[in-house]
From Swiss-Prot:
InterPro entries: NADH_UbQ_OxRdtase-like_20kDa, NADH_UQ_OxRdtase_20Kd_su. [4Fe-4S] cluster binds at C43, C44, C108, C139. This is NAD(P)H-quinone oxidoreductase subunit K, chloroplastic. Its EC number is 7.1.1.-. NDH is composed of at least 16 different subunits, 5 of which are encoded in the nucleus. The keyword Chloroplast applies. Its cofactor is [4Fe-4S] cluster. PANTHER family: NADH DEHYDROGENASE, NADH DEHYDROGENASE [UBIQUINONE] IRON-SULFUR PROTEIN 7, MITOCHONDRIAL. One of its GO terms (molecular function) is quinone binding. It catalyses: a plastoquinone + NADH + (n+1) H(+)(in) = a plastoquinol + NAD(+) + n H(+)(out); a plastoquinone + NADPH + (n+1) H(+)(in) = a plastoquinol + NADP(+) + n H(+)(out). It comes from Populus alba.
Length: 225
């Protein structure tokens, strides 16, 4: 049994019989199977690396780091986010399957940190790009604080309602693109045909200046659609 109490559990008279809802069962099954995508750009990420050792042992929480966003349900941003990296971060978040969560780790990620005063290329908070579930302040946060943030995220998941989560994410989504493939007929000549795969311009190809101007000029509802 997980260390976190089973959410909204109704027990019947026999001890061996448990009744609950499919939503609560889904939440409970995801508590110990968080697969994080580690997005580290600065010194805060070194503190997270301390959790890999036997002293803190983050494996006991079921955390399995993934190198692909399509296999992750948690992205942990640690370090400074520049305007040039902002489109790439949003693209990684959009590639993650539902349900997905975000932990903002460190002062530079949350507010821009010491780079937010004089730097023209620093994003003043990652929540301007993607919705954040847990804020973890510090410069840098200790490994114990990271474990506490993961525990708070698991408690939030245990009380979550799926429909409310999807509705909230659709309202807070900052930027999105549709990726479409065009399939055509060709002969096997050994040469790669660039015309076979057609994809609209992605966020990684958008200049940082144009990216932020587009966000300011268009409402959030238009961005989603």
């Amino acid at each position: 049994m997980n260390s976190i109490e089973f959410p909204l559990l109704d027990r019947t008279t026999p001890i061996s019989v448990i009744s609950t809802t499919s939503n609560d069962l889904s939440n409970w099954s995801r508590l110990s199977s968080l697969w994080p995508l580690l997005y580290g750009t600065s010194c805060c990420f070194i503190e997270f690396a301390s959790l890999i050792g036997s002293r803190f042992d983050f494996d006991r929480y079921g955390l399995v780091p993934r190198s692909s966003p399509r296999q992750a349900d948690l992205i942990l941003t640690a370090g400074t986010v520049t305007m040039k990296m902002a489109p790439s971060l949003v693209r990684l978040y959009e590639q993650m399957p539902e349900q997905k969560y975000v932990i903002a780790m460190g002062a530079c990620t949350i507010t821009g940190g010491m780079f937010s005063t004089d730097s023209y290329s620093t994003v003043r908070g990652v929540d301007k790009l993607i919705p954040v579930d847990v804020y973890l302040p510090g410069c840098p946060p200790k490994p114990e604080a990271i474990i506490d943030a993961i525990t708070k995220l698991r408690k939030k998941i245990s009380r979550e309602i799926y429909e409310d989560r999807i509705r909230s994410q659709q309202g807070n989504r900052c930027f999105t693109t549709n990726h479409k493939f065009h399939i055509g007929r060709t002969t096997n000549t050994g040469n790669y045909d660039q015309g076979l795969l057609y994809q609209p311009p992605s966020t990684s190809k958008i200049a940082p200046e144009a990216f932020f101007k587009y966000k300011k000029s268009v409402s959030s509802s238009e961005l989603v659609n």
